[in-house]
Curated annotation (Swiss-Prot):
It comes from Pyrobaculum calidifontis (strain DSM 21063 / JCM 11548 / VA1). D-glyceraldehyde 3-phosphate binds at residues 139-141, 195-196. It is found in: Cytoplasm. The keyword Oxidoreductase applies. Pathway: Carbohydrate degradation; glycolysis; pyruvate from D-glyceraldehyde 3-phosphate: step 1/5. This is Glyceraldehyde-3-phosphate dehydrogenase.
Length: 344
């Protein structure tokens, strides 16, 4: 049984903790919170031991939250630590808590790539991460792009170049201090956005350029992709590649999928926790092939898409399961769409 500690119990961390708790080969030994807020109380109510920094223990006690120990205590009790701290805090934690303890550590895409030995996406480079001490799961947008490109590559469809245009959600649903509210903001104005170079930390030989804007929504990101293939292909070939690849969902307008909000509503109706949609949501009707040119649009649920990747990264770090066994095990445990998917 792999003992997993989760440092940071916010948007991503709480989802990772819940996902780890569903694995039959892992258990959550504790989570780190720095503020004694409602999320800390929920963590305790879910049965996760709560840890914090040594100088914050008294604040938690005053708030009526039992503290199991310090950050150092949790790291010592863990086989693998998943750091889901806010951007750049993971690097600080590495220097402050992690370097001196010989464990395995998983960081998130908000950290720069050099925080880890390898940037990770399960479909693309699971084996490259096996046995690594420091692994970085790439960001939500990078995960979405990498999955789409990997679906093609894994099915023998080569890529000459990819040009991806991203409409980023302005904030997560709970982020009341972020925006925009009534604007469309180049994010950044310069080309490329950071997503293309980030994809290349995983798929190192892909010719990719990305551009992004932030828009006043909270539900999901939308990607509009132009991909030049290695030669003429049929639309059916591309659709079959997406249909067979895990963690990709093909949505039909005829079935009622006409917007990103409908994916979230679908997830709620399915009874998925928090209305999460970890799959890349590809609009089947948008998939267009003209000779060697592929066009498509797809949605990326920023709050949950990286969660299955983190579970697989834990196994990769310890080298306990082969790639496809881990991916299938994770997908089934999280009740992702597995019918018709190829795990080999």
């Amino acid at each position: 049984m792999i003992k997993v500690g989760v440092v940071g119990y916010g948007t991503i961390g709480k989802r990772i903790a819940d996902a780890v708790a569903l694995q039959d080969d892992m258990r959550v030994v504790g989570v780190v919170k720095m503020t004694p807020d409602y999320e800390a109380k929920i963590a305790a109510a879910r049965g996760f031991p709560v840890y914090t920094a040594a100088d914050r223990v008294e604040k938690f006690k005053k708030a009526g939250i039992e503290v199991a120990g310090t950050v150092e205590d949790l790291v010592k009790a863990s086989d693998v630590v998943v750091d889901a701290s806010p951007e750049d805090v993971g690097r600080e934690n590495k220097e402050k808590y992690y370097r001196q303890l010989d464990k395995r550590y998983i960081f998130q895409g908000g950290e720069e790539a050099d925080v880890a030995e390898v940037s990770f996406n399960a479909l693309a480079n699971y084996d490259e991460a096996r046995g690594k001490r420091y692994i970085r799961v790439v960001s939500c947008n990078t995960t979405g792009i990498t999955r789409v490109l990997s679906a093609l590559l894994l099915n023998g469809i080569g890529i000459r170049k990819a040009r991806i245009f991203i409409a980023r959600r302005g904030a997560d649903p709970k982020e009341h201090k972020k925006g925009p509210i009534n604007d469309v903001v180049p994010n950044p104005t310069a080309v490329p956005s950071h997503h293309g170079p980030d994809v290349q930390t995983v798929l190192k030989d892909v010719d990719i350029v990305t551009m992004a804007v932030a828009v006043p929504v909270t539900i999901m990101h939308m990607h509009m992709a132009y991909i030049e293939l290695d030669g003429p292909r049929s639309r059916d070939e591309v659709l079959e590649a997406f249909a067979k690849t895990p963690r990709i969902f093909l949505a039909d307008v005829g079935s009622g999928f006409q917007s990103l909000a409908q994916f979230i509503e679908y997830a709620r109706d399915l009874g998925r926790p928090r209305g999460d949609f970890p799959e890349v949501a590809v609009f089947r009707d948008s998939v267009t092939v003209r000779g060697d040119e592929l066009y498509l649009m797809y949605g990326v649920h920023q709050e949950s898409i990286v969660v299955p990747e983190n579970v697989d990264a834990i196994r990769a770090a310890l080298g306990v399961l082969p790639k496809w066994q881990s991916i299938e095990k994770t997908d089934k445990s999280l009740k992702l769409f597995t019918e018709g998917k190829r795990y080999a």
